[in-house]
Amino acid sequence: MLIEQLWTANAYRNFNYLIACPETGEALAIDPLDHRQCLATAKRNGWRITQIFNTHEHGDHTGGNEAIIAQTKGKLLAHHKARDKIRGIDEGLAAGDTVKVGNGVALKVLDTPGHTMSHLCLFAPSNPPALFCGDTLFNAGAGNCHNGGDPNALYATFTQQLALLPCNTRIYPGHEYIENNLGFTLDREPDNEQAMALLAEVKSQDPNHAFVSTLALEKEINTFFRLDNPTLITKLRETFPDLPRVPDPKTVFLKLRELRNKW
C-alpha cells in the first residue's frame, strides 16, 4: 500500500489522502477537497484514481468530489446513511465492509459516529497498520460535535473501537491541528513530558512533511484517551467542582469535550 498525505494549506488545515496499489497503480482519494493537488499527485506518480471516499458529509471533505469524478469517472463511496447529505454516492458503506484498491489493498470500514452520525474511518491492516480517521480522531485531539454530531457517540467510538486497534497503528487525520491540541493537553496535564517534547518538535514542522503519530503515542498525549489520569481529573475538578471523587470515564470524556469546545 502506498500513501500520499497531501497538505492543502487552506484555512481549515485539511489533509487529503491518496492510497494506491503498487501492483496496478489504482488509487483511492480520501476527502479530496484540493482536487487539483490530488489529480496532479496521482499523475506524477503514474496512478489512476478509480474511487473517491468521503469520511463524512462536511463540505471541506466533499468539496472536491465533482471535479475529481469529472476527471476520473471514479466511483464515490461514503456512509450508507449519508445519501441525503452527499450528492452522487455510488456505494453506501457500513461497518465491516471492505474497500479494495487494485489487487493488493483491502481497507476495513469502521462506522465511527460522533463528529457526525454518518462518519466512517478506514483501517488498513498493513505492516504497520494505518487508520484514516477524518474528523473523528486528530493528533492529540478529538473531533467536535457541533454540526450534526453527538459527544456520547464520540465517546463510544473512542472507547469501543479506536482504543482497541493495534498500538502501532499510524494515524492519518483529516486536519493538521497537532500544535493547538498539544496545547490543550498541557493545559489539562501540565506534567505530560511526552506532550511537551512533541510540542517542541512540531512547532517547526513543515505540514507538507507532517509528523505521523501512532495509537500508542496518542494514548500518551491525547487527553481523550487518558480518562483515568489523576492529574487530568484533579485539573478537571477545578472547573467542575461537583465531579465525583472517582469519576467514570464517560463523564471525564464529556467534560473534556465541553472544555475543548471553548478552549
Curated annotation (Swiss-Prot):
Keywords: Hydrolase, Metal-binding, Zinc. GO terms for molecular function: hydroxyacylglutathione hydrolase activity; metal ion binding. Zn(2+) 2 binds at residues 60-61, 135, 175. InterPro entries: Clx_II_MBL, Glyoxalase_II_hydrolase, HAGH_C, Hydroxyacylglutathione_Hdrlase, Metallo-B-lactamas, RibonucZ/Hydroxyglut_hydro. It is an enzyme of class 3 (hydrolase). Its cofactor is Zn(2+). Pfam families: HAGH_C, Lactamase_B. Binds 2 Zn(2+) ions per subunit. Its EC number is 3.1.2.6. Thiolesterase that catalyzes the hydrolysis of S-D-lactoyl-glutathione to form glutathione and D-lactic acid. Belongs to the metallo-beta-lactamase superfamily. Glyoxalase II family. Monomer. This is Hydroxyacylglutathione hydrolase. It comes from Nitrosococcus oceani (strain ATCC 19707 / BCRC 17464 / JCM 30415 / NCIMB 11848 / C-107). The lineage of its organism: Bacteria, Pseudomonadati, Pseudomonadota, Gammaproteobacteria, Chromatiales.
